[in-house]
């Protein structure tokens, strides 16, 4: 199991591409989004708050499609102007929130991904018991499981998995 950390995420303007994809199609979908950003780069926002991320609203499998959304934060003051240059992307504002997260190193393996998801699931169960009778204001169903991609070197990318929430 992994240690679950907590962090505050600010309100962000996001340019997004959202689609139902099957298990095999999720990689092609991610490559499509990355190709758009490489072809027409967006202004950089430093740190995790500015990193591209993927939201799994539901998980694709061999048996069914899942709803996935790729997002790139953009400067709020430039968001509407930038959106005009990306007609295939949708502009939306994400509210400020807290996230429970697990960080994985560059070169992570599938087993580490599974352990990280298990750690987040265990955290959610503990929070639900601690706050019995209350509703976590933002749940995975509200904002999905997020995967944030962070460059750690010229060819290395570390990721973290996060669940948004607020008590």
Annotated model-derived regions:
Residues 1-167:
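A solvent-exposed interaction/effector surface
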């Amino acid at each position: 199991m992994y240690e679950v950390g907590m962090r505050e995420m600010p309100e962000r303007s996001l340019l997004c591409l959202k689609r139902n994809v099957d298990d095999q199609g999720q990689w092609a979908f991610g490559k499509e989004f990355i190709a758009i950003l490489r072809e027409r780069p967006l202004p950089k926002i430093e740190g995790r708050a500015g990193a591209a991320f993927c939201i799994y609203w539901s998980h694709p499998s061999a048996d069914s499609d899942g709803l996935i959304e790729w997002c790139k934060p953009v400067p709020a003051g430039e968001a509407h102007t930038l959106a005009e240059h990306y007609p295939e992307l949708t502009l939306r504002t994400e509210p400020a929130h807290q996230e429970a997260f697990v960080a994985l190193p560059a070169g992570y393996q599938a087993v580490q991904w599974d352990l990280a998801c298990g750690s987040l699931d265990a955290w959610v169960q503990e929070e639900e018991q601690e706050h019995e009778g209350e509703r976590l204001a933002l749940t995975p169903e509200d904002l999905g499981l997020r995967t944030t991609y962070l460059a750690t070197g010229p060819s290395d990318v570390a990721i973290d998995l996060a669940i948004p929430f607020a008590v």
